[in-house]
Every structure is written in C-alpha cells, then in structure tokens.
C-alpha cells in the first residue's frame, strides 16, 4: 500500500500537477491516518507497573516508551533514528532580521555533507542515527554536493513581508516531499524520525506561523533567533507584523499559512509528520521551527498529533506557545537555540535506552518473579512492630535534663 503511494508521490514531485490534485492526495493521506493503538502498549504498561513499583514510577520515561509502543508496537529489532535536516532560504532575510547572511544556509548544508563537522553531524553520530540532508530551496548551487536530496522547489521563498512566501502549489509540493520521505523511511524499517532544519531567517517565518495558528500577538512568538540585538529584535517583530498584515493567513487552513508566511523546509517537516502518522512512525520534535511545522501539520491533519513527541523547550519565545497549542509536554528544558535535531537526538537516546531497559525488565519470567519477591520481602514485614515500656528507655536515659 505504501509502496504504491510512494511511486505515485515520486511521479507527482517530478511533474507539474494541478493544485487541486495535489491537495486531494494530501487529504486522502490524512484520511487514512489511524489512531495510535493504545491496546498495543496497555498490557506492556500493566506488566511494567507490576515489576517497577510504584505505579508509573518511571514518570516521563514510561510515557515516552508507551507512546512509542502505541505507535510502532514492540520492535523485533529497533532501528536507529533518522536525523533529517531540511534546508531552505527565506526571502524575508532581505529585511535584515538575522545576525547571519543568507549564504550561511548554503555553507551549513555544505558542512553537513562535506566536512561533516556541524553540530547536526555530532549529535547524529552520538545517537548512531542515519543522517539525511535535503535542499528544498537553498539560494545557491548544491548540484555537486554528495549525499543530499536535490529537491529545490525554488531558490528561496519570496519576501513574505511584501507578498506570499510561495505559491499554494509550491507549498503542497514541499508537504508531499516530506510525506514521501516518511513513507520511504518506514519501508526501510525506521520508526523514529528526528526532523531538523537550516534556513537563515526561518525563526521569523515560524514566529508568523505560530502567531497566526495560535491566535496570539507576534510579540509573544517573536524571539532572538540567532541571538540578535535588541534593535534587530524590534525590527524582526515589525517584519513579522508586516508579514501577517500583508498576507492575512487563514489560521484554519494550514496550507494557506504555509503558503503565505512559511518556508519550504518547514513545509517538508510538516509533510514528514503527516507521512509518519500515516506510516506509524514517531516524530520527535526539536526546537521552535519544528514545532511551527507541527502546527501546520496538525492543522491540515489533526490526528497526526498523536504521533509527535516534544524533546525539549528551547530558547525561542514562541516555542512554549506552540507546544501548548499542540498539547505536548516537553521532556527537557534545555534553552537550545540550534535547530539541527540536537535536542531531539538527546530525547531519542533517552527513549531508545529506556525502551531497551523496559524490555529487559520483562524479558525473563524468572527474573520477574524474583524481583517481585525481593520487593515484597523488603516492603512487607512479617509482623507489626510491638511497642513495650522498654522501647524508649535509651532515649529517656540519654536525654539532657
């Protein structure tokens, strides 16, 4: 079923398609997303609570493991996660809202696949992840870069402070690419996806997305991004307000919000989330930009929310607002400002080791009963303590007058 869909999506991505057809396919995929299987983890949870008292004593770790099992089931072999970095430039960078020049996006993409010396590479190696990099809209030539998906919908979005960031067809194309990638990765056996992004000025786009969908003022969603100055922060806030006033995105239409104020890499991450939900994969969000993409994904496909986990709360002002709208509790508070699947790598490592430990607890019935017996021996006394008139003699005799 997924193989047929992947072939169709591949054809669509290489042909000029009518926007209505693209939207019909996205809608069909969303309709096929199933609720997570709570029964798949229920029996596991009951046994775990028996073996590791008190009930739910493992806290967030237990919740992480149960969410994964309800999505993917108990794995015969747990594959490593996929660290997927989506790259694109943003036309709004012309408004001077970032501390870095736009060509930084190309330089970082080159670093990912040539010298492999970025934080994204280091954390992917740490979690033993499969690393993928995609050019959705870098304003520069990446044809000679190895190990990169050359998608390039356009060399950067348009300046959303002046006009819509992209056409609706371009927005749908970015979504479909992400959907296709999630389906393809599931066919290869991967079930934990860690989206990251690189795109100078993309926190400006994310601030506009969060303000639009969460229905809050831009003051609450606009942060310092790459640690910009107070003066530039005020400029950035004014630009976010201008983006929203110019384009008037419809908060109920995720594709419209993406079209008006989004980015190609954010659309691809939103698509990855929808495709993961369709394919029963877990997506662990990283920072604010991935949360903004999740807002788009869940506006288009509300049932995809059950397939998302929030790794951490970062340093951007809009991050907690986006997570609250998504109904997600972050696992950690890290104040990370990089968006290269760093926080999500740490969460994935915690999940994978937690899952392995929980499976190990249940591995042997002999060990299980021995453990329960030991706990009962410690916690249940053979008889209650008997108090006599001698019980407090030591204390009364040694007390100072």
Could you tell me what each predicted segment is?
Residues 1-6:
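Short, Lys/Arg-enriched N-terminal segments with co-localized hydrophobic residues
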Residues 7-400:
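N-terminal loops that bind phosphate or other acidic moieties
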